[in-house]
Each structure stands twice: as C-alpha cells, then as structure tokens.
C-alpha cells in the first residue's frame, strides 16, 4: 500500500435529529419532558429552551456545571494537536514531564499510547483524559479528547465531537487552513460545537497569523478575530499580548510553566490598538449588545468585550483566535483561560433526542443536566482493554454509580456497572459515581458505538441524535497466511465493533474476505494491528476502488417470474417504473385493489434491497434509484414471498439495464504542498493523472495546489510525488463526490467483470 489515501463524505448534517442519507447511523438516547417540543433552528431558539431548563436546575447542579468543560482538540494532520495536548496536561499538572510525538525520547506523547502511533508520529485513536485548571481562584475540571488529524480516522473525530460541548481548533501558522481543517470545521458544524482557535507553530519560519485568520474567515466562513498579538515571530517568538486588557504575557521557566505579565512593548502598541479595534468591530457584527455599544461610539470595558466573545462563541457566530507555539512552550496557558471564559459548560448546550411513541412515531425531547433526573448516557467509543471491552460513556442526565444497573435501550437488557473509571489515555482511575455532563468508562458491557443507556426502571424508549458514519471508499481482500482462522475472525469482529467505518464481508463468489475503509492508511493500520495484537500475518490483495452503479433515465418494467417443476411452482409478476433520484435509494408501492398482498410487497422491498448491494453492471452498490411497483399479478397456488422477491430481482435488472446505466467512481479533493521550485513538476504530475486543478496558492517558500482527481488514478501517487519533489512534497485526499467514469473505462470494467464471472462458472 504505497500511498496514503484518505476519504470521507462531504455531507452536512444538522445536529439534533435528522438522519443522514446514504450513510450508516447510530441511535442513541434521550429523555425528559412529555410535552411536544418544537426543534430549534438557531442558537437563539436553543437558548430559550436552555434558559427554561436551567430554571429547574438545583444550585448544586448549576455549580457543578459551571466548573466543567468537555472539549476536544482537532486540526489538520501535523498542525501540532498532540504536542499542544501534551503541554495542556503538563501545565495542568496531569503529567510530570513533557514527552514528544514519535517517541523520540523512548516514551512518546501521553495521548498517543499505541505503539503504532508513537512509531508513525500520528494519532490513530482519539484518547480521553481529564485535568484541572485554576483561574481566578476557582478550579475548573476539563474532560479532554485528542483526536486524529488523518482523514482516514475521521470516525474518531465524529464520535468525539458528538459528545463534546466545545473544541480547540489548532491551525498551523505557516500552512494556515488546510483540507482537513475544512473537514473538521464541517464536523464541528454538524454537531453544533463552538470553538476557540489556536494558531500554532508561531516559531516556524514563514509563520503568518494574520494570513491564517483571513483564511479562517474566507474558507471556514466563520467570523474570526485575534484576541492576541505575538511578541516577536519565528525564532524570535517571546510571548503574546492579550489585546483585550492590553497586557503582555511571557512564558518563563525551563518549560514555560511560569507566566510573567508586563506592559505592552512600545513597538507593538499601535498594532495592539489596531487589532483591538478590529476585534470590537467584528464582535459588533455578531453580538447585539456590542453592536449597541459600538454604534453609540462608546469604548467597551474588558468585561463587555469578554461577555460579547463568550456569547458569540457559544452561539457559534464567532471564534476568538489565540496564537503561540506548543513545541516552544509559548502561549498555551492563555488558551486554557479561554476555554474557561469562552467555551460552554454542559448546561449551556441543548442536547435533544427522540422518544419512541406507542404508534411508533418519535417525539423530540430535551435532556436536563441534573443528577436528580433519571440517568441517560451515550456509549460513544469502544476499546479492547485488559479487563474486556472498555465502553466510553457520556452522561447527559442523572448520574451513574458503580454497582448500579442500567438498561440498554436497543436490546432492553439490564446491565450492571461492575466498574466505573475515568480515563487518562491508557491509564484509568476508579470512581464511585459520575454526574451529568461527565465522561467515564466501564467494563463488561456488550454494546456498540452509539448505543444508549437509561436508568433502570425508566419506561420511555428514547434515542438520541444519530452519529454520522461515512461510507467506505476503498476495499481489499485479506486472508491469514496460516490456518489461524480463530484469531483472525476474532480480530475482524472486534475491529468492526470498535470502528463503524471499518467494514468486513465475505464474498461468496471469490471466496475471499473483503475489508473496506476510509483509505489505504486506514486499512494498512488494521492489517498491522491484526499482526501485532493477534499474532496473525495476513496476505492482502491490491486495493480496489469502491465504484457505484446508477441510472440516468427513467425505465418501465413488466417482469414475470415463473417456475414450474412439478408440484407447487413459483409465480410473481411486478409492473412499475424506475427513476434516477439525487437522494437516497427509495422503494415505493402504489397497488390499487390489493392485486399484490402486503406480505408479497414486503418481499419485493427485500428484493430491492438485495439488488442495491450488487448492481447488474459490475457487482458494485447501486446509488440514486427510485423503484415504484404500481401493478402486478399473483397465482392462487404458486405465488409466494420467495417468488415475488425473485421477481423483483428480475424486474430491477431489466429496468436498470434499460435506463442507460453508468458506473460512478469516487472523485477526491487533492491538496499538494511542496517547495516552490517543484511547482511545475507537481502540476505536470496532476495533469498526467487527468486531474482538474482548482486553485494554486503560492507562499514565500511553498505552494499549495488543490485539484480534483479520480481515486483510481491516485494509487501510487505517494511514490510519484516523492520522486517529483525529492521527498519534500506532501499531500492529502478527501472524498468529494461520485462522478461517471469515461465511456472507455466503463466498457473495460464491464468486460473485466463479465470475464471474471464467466471464469467462475
């Protein structure tokens, strides 16, 4: 697997209750009042509901929520997330020494606890921890999750953001907003997660925070303004100026653990005032109170500015921007202060779910972050631990106690919480109970990611908003070198359960096990983990693109399945039409007069689902088809569910092949960054692949090209890029869309498929 390919659907999903189209979902849980609830569309509407809920909270609940922050650290790969998190843990006293990524000191960053993570210098799994931060003589509790930057491991970001209340978005001061930054921004919007932004690597040559802020405004389309100005830059970075209260902050001590406050340097005073005015002007555009002050020509106080930043940030209308260097131990502590000042506490976030009614309809309900309400929790992540399956749970309502029983909503089973722990990367600390808003883990519970648990004895059947799971874009065959099928099967089952984007199926025709995922790196990591964790060496086939099949014009069908071989035969006739649609696949019936009984129509729907999994052209999944059955015929003796299911198979194939079918291939958004002297070589390489260049940005030393290329053309691109740039170029891929293949490619794919099918007979 030479190249590192990464892909994910660019589907925007509103947070609370809509389920994504053409994607897998996980049902979760929610619980509260019985009255009908209207879903809010904006944060202002959410806040009305939040304020009502907060009126019912007890002082102890409010106090606990005020001191709690659930935050994630997200960014493009190599922006310094894990290095930043390591400093956070050190400055909060959670670890006693700083260790670097890649395990250069034989230890490695605390949050990258897998050997593979430390060897490769990347985060593969999200890691959870907790720490405390003191500000203004008050102690605040942070639940912190460090997430991967590789698009291949995007599900780790999805499930982290699903349960977090806020985030720190880390942006590289040199590279600025990159492809995965845009993806992470979209994921934050999907789950309505507010963020503060930290511009990292200010000590690097070419660092330009103002360009990065312009890109945040332009590319991420969220108002952003600096609340700091750097003191020095690149190798001369000394500290930052807090422009809100006009104070210079210097990191001192061997590892920057001490903050010294001083007056603003004389040569920066003009810039500080300029950026302060820009901050106030930006806030006036997104906050009514600041707008009133601004229009009246008054000078806002420090408290008024901070209040406006907090309201606008929590309202997801603005992101404050801080800057520094995690590696150089500069500017980290002010970010922790900003987490306290500007990111929401649990009772400032509206968590909504669905309660199943007796008529099978679903009613939206809101959760209360109170320990006195019935328990509701979401299992958002699974890991294989030394004591069995480790299940991470976010407590949305009530409290969870060691030794207590809770109900698994999906199965209705009662399970006992035999052990309750807080996680610190791969270490754990036993606790007796956790309250609303907290994140914990427990052992010995049989469940899947996204399952909901409620307190024992609770009558409501409740599911929370769904977690978005992107479709796989790449597959390969895999088999153990030896006959150790037991360990191999155990590994497959475990990894599927832990990672919803890792798919496994057995191809009965080729007699092969096929694994599918988000990219070559994604699958490569799992092949390596099977070897390391289960002692099973595997042989893998060449990576295969996950094509799709679709139709382009409507097509009518009239198909009769008739089989007679003595005794009762098989008979089923279905009539209708097939149409191309842009949304999810759809099956519909409009039968008048009961010509086809309901049980046979149900069999038809199952037949339709069968056909979607394996299209008539090359055996790949079908996309964007609407099948309507509006007439048909039965036989009093020979008609059966099997007959109508088989008839649907025949009708589907008949209509599909008559509807000018096409083969769709994944088109990837490719971003290549390399030194300027290699620009011609890189552009030529992309053109050779048949790619379409959309944008080129030239920096002082490097350039970045954004293009669209077919995934099929990208195999081996890593090697080609390395050769074209003397090993100095890097690239990332993200799934963009499905697009029809060229006619000659479609013809070749069909011929190869037909040849392979004939060889099996």
UniProtKB/Swiss-Prot annotation:
Residue range covered by the transit peptide = 1-33
Give the keywords, sorted. Elongation factor, GTP-binding, Mitochondrion, Nucleotide-binding, Protein biosynthesis, Transit peptide
Alphabetical list of Gene3D superfamilies matching this protein: 3.30.230.10, 3.30.70.240, Elongation Factor G (Translational Gtpase), domain 3, P-loop containing nucleotide triphosphate hydrolases, Translation factors
List locations, semicolon-separated. Mitochondrion
* Single Gene Ontology BP annotation: mitochondrial translational elongation
Q: Where is the tr-type G domain?
A: 66-347
Q: Which GO terms describe its cellular component?
A: mitochondrion
Residue numbers binding GTP: 75-82, 146-150, 200-203
Q: Which GO terms describe its molecular function?
A: GTP binding; GTPase activity; translation elongation factor activity
InterPro entries the UniProt entry points to = EFG_II (IPR041095), EFG_III (IPR009022), EFG_III/V (IPR035647), EFG_IV (IPR047872), EFG_V-like (IPR000640), EFTu-like_2 (IPR004161), P-loop_NTPase (IPR027417), Ribosomal_Su5_D2-typ_SF (IPR020568)
- Pathway(s) annotated for this protein in UniProt: Protein biosynthesis; polypeptide chain elongation
NCBIfam families, alphabetized: EF-G (TIGR00484), PRK12740.1-5 (NF009381), small_GTP (TIGR00231)
The record's section on HAMAP family has:
EF_G_EF_2_B (MF_00054_B)
Q: Which family does it belong to?
A: Belongs to the TRAFAC class translation factor GTPase superfamily. Classic translation factor GTPase family. EF-G/EF-2 subfamily.
Q: What does this protein do?
A: Mitochondrial GTPase that catalyzes the GTP-dependent ribosomal translocation step during translation elongation. During this step, the ribosome changes from the pre-translocational (PRE) to the post-translocational (POST) state as the newly formed A-site-bound peptidyl-tRNA and P-site-bound deacylated tRNA move to the P and E sites, respectively. Catalyzes the coordinated movement of the two tRNA molecules, the mRNA and conformational changes in the ribosome.
- Recorded protein name is Elongation factor G, mitochondrial
The organism's lineage is:
Eukaryota, Fungi, Dikarya, Ascomycota, Saccharomycotina
């Amino acid at each position: 697997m030479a190249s590192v390919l990464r892909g994910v659907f660019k589907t925007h999903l509103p947070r609370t209750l809509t389920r994504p189209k053409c994607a897998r979902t996980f049902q979760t849980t929610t619980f509260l009042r019985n009255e009908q609830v209207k879903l809010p569309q904006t944060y202002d509407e959410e806040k009305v509901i939040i304020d009502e809920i907060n009126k019912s909270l007890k002082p102890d609940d409010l106090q606990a929520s005020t001191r709690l922050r659930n935050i994630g650290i997200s960014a493009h790969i190599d922006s310094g997330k894990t290095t930043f998190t390591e400093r956070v843990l050190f400055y909060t006293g959670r670890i006693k020494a700083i260790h670097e990524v890649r395990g250069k000191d034989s230890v490695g960053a605390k949050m990258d606890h897998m050997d593979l993570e430390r060897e490769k210098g990347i985060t593969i799994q999200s890691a959870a921890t907790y720490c405390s931060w003191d500000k203004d003589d008050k102690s605040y509790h942070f639940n912190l999750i460090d997430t991967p930057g590789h698009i291949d491991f995007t599900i780790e970001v999805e499930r982290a953001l699903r349960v977090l209340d806020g985030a720190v978005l880390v942006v590289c001061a040199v590279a600025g907003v990159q492809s995965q930054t845009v993806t992470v921004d979209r994921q934050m919007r999907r789950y309505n997660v507010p963020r503060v932004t930290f511009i990292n690597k200010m000590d690097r040559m070419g660092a330009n925070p103002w360009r990065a802020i312009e890109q945040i405004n332009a590319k991420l389309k969220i108002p952003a303004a600096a609340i700091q100005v750097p003191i020095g830059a690149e190798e001369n970075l000394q500290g930052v100026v807090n422009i809100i209260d006009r104070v210079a902050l210097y990191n001192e001590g061997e590892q920057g653990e001490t903050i010294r406050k001083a007056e603003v340097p004389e040569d920066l005073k003009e810039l500080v005032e300029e950026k302060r005015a820009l901050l106030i002007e930006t806030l006036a555009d997104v906050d009514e109170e600041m707008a009133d002050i601004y229009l009246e020509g008054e000078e806002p106080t420090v408290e008024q500015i901070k209040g406006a930043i907090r309201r606008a940030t929590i309202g997801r209308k603005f992101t404050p921007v801080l800057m520094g260097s995690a590696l150089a131990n500069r500017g980290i502590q002010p970010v922790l202060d900003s987490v306290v000042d500007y990111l929401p506490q649990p009772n400032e976030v509206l968590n909504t779910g669905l309660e199943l009614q007796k008529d099978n309809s679903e009613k939206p309900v809101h959760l209360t972050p109170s320990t006195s309400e019935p328990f509701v929790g979401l299992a958002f992540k699974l890991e294989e631990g030394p004591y069995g399956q480790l299940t991470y749970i976010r407590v949305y309502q009530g409290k969870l106690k060691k030794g207590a029983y809770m109900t698994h909503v999906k199965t209705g089973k009662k399970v006992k919480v035999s052990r309750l722990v807080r996680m610190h990367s791969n270490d754990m600390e036993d606790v007796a109970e956790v309250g609303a808003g907290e994140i914990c883990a427990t052992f010995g519970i049989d469940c899947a990611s996204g399952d909901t648990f409620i307190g024992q004895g609770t009558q409501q059947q409740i599911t929370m908003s769904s977690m978005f799971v992107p479709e796989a874009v790449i597959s390969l065959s895999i088999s153990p070198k030896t006959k150790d099928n037991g360990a191999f099967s155990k590994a497959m089952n475990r990894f599927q359960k832990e990672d919803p984007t890792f798919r496994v199926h057995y191809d009965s025709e080729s007699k092969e096990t096929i694994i599918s995922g988000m990219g070559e790196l994604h699958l490569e990591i799992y092949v390596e983990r099977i070897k390391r964790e289960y002692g099973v060496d595997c042989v893998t086939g060449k990576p295969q693109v996950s094509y799709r099949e679709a139709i382009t014009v409507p097509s009518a069908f009239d198909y009769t399945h008739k089989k007679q071989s003595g005794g009762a035969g098989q008979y089923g006739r279905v009539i209708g039409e097939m149409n191309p649609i842009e949304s999810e696949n759809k099956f519909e019936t409009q039968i008048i007069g009961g010509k086809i009984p309901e049980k046979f129509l149900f069999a038809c729907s199952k037949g339709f689902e069968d056909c979607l999994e394996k299209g008539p052209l090359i055996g790949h999944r079908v996309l964007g088809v609407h099948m309507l059955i509006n007439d048909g015929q039965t036989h009093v003796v020979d008609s059966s569910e099997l007959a109508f299911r088989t008839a649907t198979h025949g009708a589907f194939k008949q209509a599909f092949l008559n509807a000018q079918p096409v083969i769709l291939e994944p088109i990837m958004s490719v971003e290549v960054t390399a030194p300027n002297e290699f620009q011609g070589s890189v552009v030529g390489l992309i053109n050779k692949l048949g790619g379409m260049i959309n944008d080129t940005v030239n920096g002082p030393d490097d350039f970045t090209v954004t293009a669209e290329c077919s995934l099929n053309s990208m195999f081996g691109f890593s090697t080609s890029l390395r050769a074209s740039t003397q090993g100095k170029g890097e690239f990332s891929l993200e799934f963009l869309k499905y697009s029809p293949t060229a006619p000659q490619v479609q013809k070749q794919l069909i011929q190869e498929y037909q040849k392979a099918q004939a060889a099996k007979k």
